[in-house]
């Protein structure tokens, strides 16, 4: 009986918390939608800014080959990485980049 009371109390508190959070979030969403001119989209950015953002976020596929090569398991990790991505395996090439097989 005590267990059921505790579970019901926790459920009521969680429901009240979630309901309160959704009610408070609604005015912010309405304010964002009403100020449509202030929304930032990808089309608002200049191509040069987009290019620089892409270069900042560029990441070469070298982690499995470079970092694991010191332990002698680079090709095995590369093959496992490629199998996880639904390829038939993979290997580390001469530039220490993981190459997945079709």
From Swiss-Prot:
UniProt keyword Oxidoreductase present: no
InterPro entries: Defensin_invertebrate/fungal (IPR001542), Scorpion_toxin-like_sf (IPR036574)
Regulation: induction: By bacterial infection.
Domain of life: Eukaryota
GO cellular component, one term: extracellular space
Chief site of localization: secreted
Subcellular location: Secreted
Disulphide bridges: 65-92, 78-98, 82-100
GO BP term (any one): defense response to Gram-positive bacterium
Swiss-Prot/TrEMBL keywords: Antibiotic, Antimicrobial, Cleavage on pair of basic residues, Defensin, Disulfide bond, Immunity, Innate immunity, Secreted, Signal
Signal peptide, first to last residue: 1-25
Record's keyword annotation contains Disulfide bond: yes
Outcome, altering residue 15 to S: In strain: Gbab1068c, Gbab5011f and Gbab5024h
Propeptide segments, given as residue ranges: 26-62
Pfam families for the chain: Defensin_2 (PF01097)
Family: Belongs to the invertebrate defensin family. Type 1 subfamily.
Function, in words: Responsible for the anti Gram-positive activity of immune hemolymph.
Name of protein: Defensin
Lineage: Eukaryota, Metazoa, Ecdysozoa, Arthropoda, Hexapoda
